[in-house]
Amino acid sequence: MGDGWRPGVADLVKNTPKVLNLKDSMKVLFLASWYPMNGRSGNGIFAIRQAEALAQAYQRFGRSVTVDVMAVQPRAWMGGRVQILGEVPGGPDQSTPRGDLRHWLLTYQDGRGGLFSLINQCWAWLRLLRAYHRHHGDRATVVVAQVAWKAAVVALLLGRPYGVMEHWSGYLEKEPPLKPITKWLVRRSLRNARSVAAVSPWLADALMQFCSGLRVSTLPNVIEEVHWTPPAVDLAAGQGAAGDVTSGSEPWRDPRVFLHVSDLAPVKNPALLFGAWALSGLSDQGYLLRVAGEYSQESKARYASVKGLEWLGILSPTELCYQLRSSRALLLSSHRETFSILAGEALLNGCSVWTSYPPLRSFYQGLDGLVSLPDDQPLTWSLALQEAAASNPHPWNSPQAVRLVQERLKPYRNHEAGQAMLSWIDAWKP
């Protein structure tokens, strides 16, 4: 295994705090295929939010249950070596109660070939599981695998009762991009699960097509509480200043500002986004496209020649809320979305959402603020941008309209989503 930085298993177990009074309580272990590299933001935050919501639900009912989240991630993804052993992390942005969720995370050396990578990952999982056992005095009662590959495969090997919670958009492709052996492992882990759920009806349908005979229910994602305070009625131009989250005041919604938030991966369709923006010519009229998210410097450089862009980088939940309340519309250019927490966050903050993805158009149908585009062609989007610039529509986000959004999205609030997760686990736990 060769990495000199790694402490031995004995040292790891010795240095992990042991809690002697937890052995008789129910223990729920979330295995996360992805773990956010930036705290409260980034790919994988959905797993943390669901685990927190579940932990808080157990607390509300006074049930003696511990909830932990565990992940093994490549160092390249996490930006270096990371070791979290049974910590309850806090942070400057306390917009969501944590529910005393305990985290376990190790990174492994990737990029050394398939066999070396597999050995490194197995070793990291073994270390974490032994440390978890030392802390709790026993194995997990039930396991929740967040995304089948690779968490459900690990859950299958553990031999504990487990359910699978799926978020991956790969199943929405005509042929999921998985190698044959990976497909076999994923299908076996799904079929051996006590229950399988997905975050949207269209993802559930795709999973059942991928794995014949599988029954898949739907469980909601979690939209953080910071987004549930209704925005103030839009101010007239000049009465505020967008982009200054430090002031604490309600931002002015700038009709000349559009927003996009993603890592600019191919599934997010950046070619459509930037192609339509450049074709529209709005930058020459003083319009601005703000781009936020976990994009790489290579992605940023690729579109450096496009005029009228402002790069924001990674945003905290509070910063995202501010930007959504500062922008005219969120441009959601994705080829596919399993649910899009971001679309819900935008509408809750009174920000219009533009999308051409049919399931999202259907899901949000009837809500003011949804701009449904007929296709994902740059010309279609550029013409829509030009038309928006030429018009001066009355703000859609009246208190009544935002209340309708809140009613539609109520199952995705922390309290309700946590209760749904608790009921799901109660239905299949031993």
Task: Please state what every model-predicted region is.
Residues 202, 222:
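Carbohydrate-associated surface elements
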Residues 117-128, 142-160:
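An aromatic- and histidine-rich active-site surface loop
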Residues 367-379, 383-393:
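Conserved acidic donor-binding segment of nucleotide-sugar-dependent glycosyltransferases
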Residues 11-89, 281:
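N-terminal subdomain of nucleotide-sugar transferases
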Residues 352-356:
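Short hydrophobic beta-strand element within catalytic cores of glycosyltransferases
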Residues 179-196:
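Membrane-proximal helix-turn-helix segments that form the acceptor-binding/catalytic region
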Residues 299-318:
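Nucleotide-activated donor-binding/catalytic signature segment of Leloir-type glycosyltransferases, i.e.
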Residues 335:
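Aromatic "clamp/platform" in nucleotide-sugar-dependent glycosyltransferases that forms part
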